[in-house]
Curated annotation (Swiss-Prot):
Cross-referenced SUPFAM superfamilies: Nucleic acid-binding proteins (SSF50249), Translation proteins SH3-like domain (SSF50104)
Gene designation: efp
Protein source organism: Rhodococcus erythropolis (strain PR4 / NBRC 100887)
Protein name: Elongation factor P
Primary location recorded for the protein, binned into one broad class: cytoplasm
Pathway: Protein biosynthesis; polypeptide chain elongation
Length: 187
């Protein structure tokens, strides 16, 4: 059990028999009335996102989630194959469980897999990943119609917006949570 004061991003709650992870939360103390906590929850299995409000101090059932270090090996049809670093067992995780994170997965990348009762819930990549630009058009000096950015295709196939000075073959640092360009990596 966790109180609303224990809420943090990534905490997995068990509500009405389903697992929900906290994406965002905000403690609110209005001028009148009792304090409450406004949350945005994501259903772990279906991916559905809902807004839910809890009264301050309410106890909520939490789920026991184990985080295991694994290495991404390869993509096989609609499954992604990971290897447990401790037991060397290979684990197959569905595309729907990996979700949008697959855009930045590279072979032999170290990740964390969250499981509940040995069922994979979600995959957490490192916050920043280093990827090589496979293709981007040359940036023209003075071209500001796109706000100083242009599209670039990375080695994983993901497409992100990068500054005009980025060229094909450059190694970039990218935020794996939202796909934002963070900087160029010096080789």
């Amino acid at each position: 059990m966790a109180s609303t004061s224990d809420f943090k991003n990534g905490l997995v709650l068990q509500i009405e028999g389903q697992l929900w992870t906290i994406i965002e939360f905000q403690h609110v103390k209005p001028g009148k009335g009792p304090a409450f906590v406004r949350t945005k929850l994501k259903n772990v299995l279906s991916g559905k996102v809902v807004d839910k409000t809890f009264n301050a101090g309410v106890k909520v059932e939490t789920a026991t989630v184990d985080r295991r270090d694994m290495t991404y090996l390869y993509h096989d049809g609609s499954d992604y194959i990971f290897m447990d670093g401790d037991t060397y067992d290979q684990v197959s995780i569905s595309e729907s469980t990996v979700g949008d994170q697959s855009r930045f997965l590279l072979e032999n990348m170290a990740v964390q897999v969250a499981t509940h009762e040995d069922v994979p819930l979600f995959v957490e990549l490192p916050v920043t990943v280093e990827l090589v630009v496979k293709h981007t058009d040359p940036g023209l000096q003075g071209d500001r119609s796109t706000g100083g950015t242009k599209p670039a295709t990375l080695e994983t196939g993901a497409e992100i917006n990068v500054p005009l000075f980025i060229n094909t073959g450059d190694k970039l640092k990218v935020d794996s949570r939202d796909g934002n360009y963070l900087g160029r990596v010096n080789s």
